[in-house]
């Protein structure tokens, strides 16, 4: 079955092409740390031959606690992104939370991301669509895979069909997430075979029901990522940090930065194997 291709400059994203890595840090903690993390990702992905897009947030507007670190904000964040692009020649993905942010962000980065909690907000979707940028839609934890087609339709009606879908798990009772591996195929079918990627970092979240920040299960990042890659998907979304225990956001789910290369070697081996198989139709 023909898979839709979404192009991010010279990077082609599709379910049957070699996987694209969307990776970096959860939130911009500082200019220097962003440079360090981006350089490491670029070095490793170039060594392994993996197409790469750098990820970071300039504002974490959905933190659980009013006291939690949110980021440097729009103006300073765009300056850091511009420096990263100039220094490393890297593509960049970041999220927007308000309609007014869509165009200023799209003027700097290559992919704008629709956060899971906001994925059904039509005014935001329409503003993002109008930019003409490539869009990454995070599947909300409370939305079934089949319903993602409706969100894609909103973008298409807004004049933008350059849409990538991203799964980050579903609510399983209170304060826990699980990933339904069958959901990747359902999302492909619901969106006319749009590229589907897997956010393994945020799928590892779990939390103290009375706590002010998310916990995580980073010890299981490899096994969960291996399972997702075995399905056959367009890309992997993974955040890393040189000192996860002291990260300003989602450290418990972050991959230790020094584990990035061995981790990606596993992911590439699985992706290469799975995509070497002929398509097998078992529906008849």
Curated annotation (Swiss-Prot):
Keywords: Cytoplasm, Lipopolysaccharide biosynthesis, Transferase. Pfam families: DAHP_synth_1. It catalyses: D-arabinose 5-phosphate + phosphoenolpyruvate + H2O = 3-deoxy-alpha-D-manno-2-octulosonate-8-phosphate + phosphate. It is found in: Cytoplasm. Pathway: Carbohydrate biosynthesis; 3-deoxy-D-manno-octulosonate biosynthesis; 3-deoxy-D-manno-octulosonate from D-ribulose 5-phosphate: step 2/3; Bacterial outer membrane biogenesis; lipopolysaccharide biosynthesis. The keyword Transferase applies. The keyword Cytoplasm applies. Its EC number is 2.5.1.55. It is an enzyme of class 2 (transferase). GO terms for cellular component: cytoplasm. GO terms for molecular function: 3-deoxy-8-phosphooctulonate synthase activity. It comes from the Bacteria. One of its GO terms (biological process) is keto-3-deoxy-D-manno-octulosonic acid biosynthetic process. SUPFAM superfamilies: Aldolase. Belongs to the KdsA family. This is 2-dehydro-3-deoxyphosphooctonate aldolase. It comes from Klebsiella pneumoniae subsp. pneumoniae (strain ATCC 700721 / MGH 78578).
